[in-house]
């Protein structure tokens, strides 16, 4: 498990090498997982995205796009996350988000703050990963997904629990 301030992540924290095949092979509580156990996306032939991808889009644009740019494409001072997730697993992503990262050399100074105690990020970390993974694999285009699955009851329960709300 990964401890992050008052949060404990780990229900599906994996330690696979790289991103792997994003194809969903398992569903649990309305979420999809690949063969390595990484959270992943599901996009139907009509363009309907799963709830996690849609939620991830919303949460990414709430907390991450200021530095990493619209749709995970990067900015002048933060890398493109859509490219980063082509080779990284959920555990790699979670480690950087929870603990932050500092990459300093004579030519650059890139610092990402730790978000391990930010409930607006941590309660939706899998969703943010799923959205960015879908972008990295060109499964969703830029902009807000037009159609999405309904929010699963399990997602509401997990969200309320993480945010300290009553179910």
Residue positions per predicted region:
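Bacterial N-terminal signal peptides
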Residues: 1-8
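Short, low-complexity, Pro/Ser/Thr/Gly-rich segments in the mature regions of secreted, periplasmic
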Residues: 149-167
């Amino acid at each position: 498990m990964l401890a992050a301030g008052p949060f404990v992540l780990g229900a599906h924290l994996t330690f696979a090498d790289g991103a792997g095949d994003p194809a969903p092979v398992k569903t649990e509580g309305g979420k999809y997982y690949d063969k390595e156990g990484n959270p992943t996306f599901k996009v139907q032939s009509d363009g309907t995205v799963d709830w996690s991808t849609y939620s991830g889009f919303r949460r990414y644009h709430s907390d991450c796009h200021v530095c990493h740019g619209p749709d995970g494409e990067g900015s002048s001072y933060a890398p493109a996350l859509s490219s980063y997730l082509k080779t990284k697993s959920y555990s790699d992503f979670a480690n950087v988000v929870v603990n932050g990262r500092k990459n300093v050399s004579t030519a650059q100074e890139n610092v990402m703050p730790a978000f391990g105690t930010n409930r607006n990020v941590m309660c939706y970390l899998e969703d943010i990963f799923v959205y960015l993974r879908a972008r990295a694999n060109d499964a969703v285009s830029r902009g807000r997904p037009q159609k999405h699955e309904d929010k699963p009851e399990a997602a509401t329960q997990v969200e309320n629990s993480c945010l300290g709300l009553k179910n």
